[in-house]
């Protein structure tokens, strides 16, 4: 099958184990397109009590938090709302220049979401106000290879609802859920200029080797 593609994007880490591969990419005319801060956290060491007042405050403002798979997935319009929310959030996630987001068909979105729920679900927390999905975070757990570690796939809040602490609350609710499930660590990343990393540092996430995204345009 022919794929209409003219760019190759790959990733390495700023770690000696990747030095040879990084040299290879540079020799092959790959260019550094984006650098990401990488963070890890032993979540069972986090003191979650100071954040309960924030969650209570948001609740009084009409903002509720639900776990997608276990609380609201059976609502008739759940996946339509979730697809719309994810697509909106994706537009604000920094990606290398020259790369564009492609919106899947709803059927393809649903297929991938079902796979996530069945095969590698860590948790997915949705923030809801007046029935509208306004923010979310999603984390994957690879149950065979790293069953005690979750990887953040996305975290975002719609623009009109930012600066209220919703992103922090989403992270706290996700951590609470993962601790109950026996997860011990979370790995996450942020583009180097994305201020979201400040939330991670405040919670006790610590830096690990950064990731580097290399891009090559092909004829």
Model feature map: region roles:
Residues 1-75, 212-216:
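Acyl-donor-binding surface of acyltransferase catalytic domains
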Residues 1-2, 23, 157, 163-176, ...:
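Conserved acetyl-CoA-binding loop-helix of GNAT-fold acetyltransferases
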Residues 131, 165, 182:
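Conserved G/P- and acidic residue-centered "switch" motifs that form tight phosphate/ATP-binding loops
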Residues 90-149, 153-157:
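A conserved beta-strand-loop-helix scaffold within acyl/acetyltransferase catalytic domains
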Residues 28-48, 123-125, 176, 181-219:
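Active-site/acyl-donor-binding loops of N-acyltransferases
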Residues 54-105:
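Short amphipathic alpha-helix that is part of the acyltransferase structural core
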Residues 8-12, 152, 186-190:
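Conserved hydrophobic beta-strand within the GNAT/NAT acetyltransferase core sheet
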């Amino acid at each position: 099958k022919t794929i209409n593609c003219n760019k190759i994007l790959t990733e390495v880490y700023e770690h000696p184990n990747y030095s040879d591969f990084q040299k290879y990419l540079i020799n092959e005319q790959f260019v550094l397109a984006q650098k990401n801060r990488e963070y890890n956290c032993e979540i069972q060491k986090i003191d979650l009590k100071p954040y309960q007042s924030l969650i209570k405050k948001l609740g009084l403002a009409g903002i509720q938090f639900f776990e997608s798979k276990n609380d609201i997935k059976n609502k008739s319009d759940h996946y339509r709302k979730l697809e719309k929310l994810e697509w909106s959030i994706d537009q604000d996630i920094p990606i290398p220049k020259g790369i564009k987001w492609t919106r899947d068909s709803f059927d393809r979105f649903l297929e991938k979401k079902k796979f996530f729920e069945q095969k590698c679900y860590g948790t997915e927390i949705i923030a809801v106000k007046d029935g509208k999905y306004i923010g979310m975070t999603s984390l994957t757990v690879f149950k065979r290879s790293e069953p005690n570690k979750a990887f953040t796939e996305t975290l975002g809040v719609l623009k009109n609802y930012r600066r209220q602490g919703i992103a922090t609350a989403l992270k706290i609710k996700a951590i609470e859920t993962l601790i109950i499930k026996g997860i011990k660590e979370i790995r996450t990343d942020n583009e180097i200029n994305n201020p979201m990393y400040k939330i991670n540092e405040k919670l006790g996430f610590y830096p690990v080797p950064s990731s580097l995204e290399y891009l090559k345009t092909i004829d």
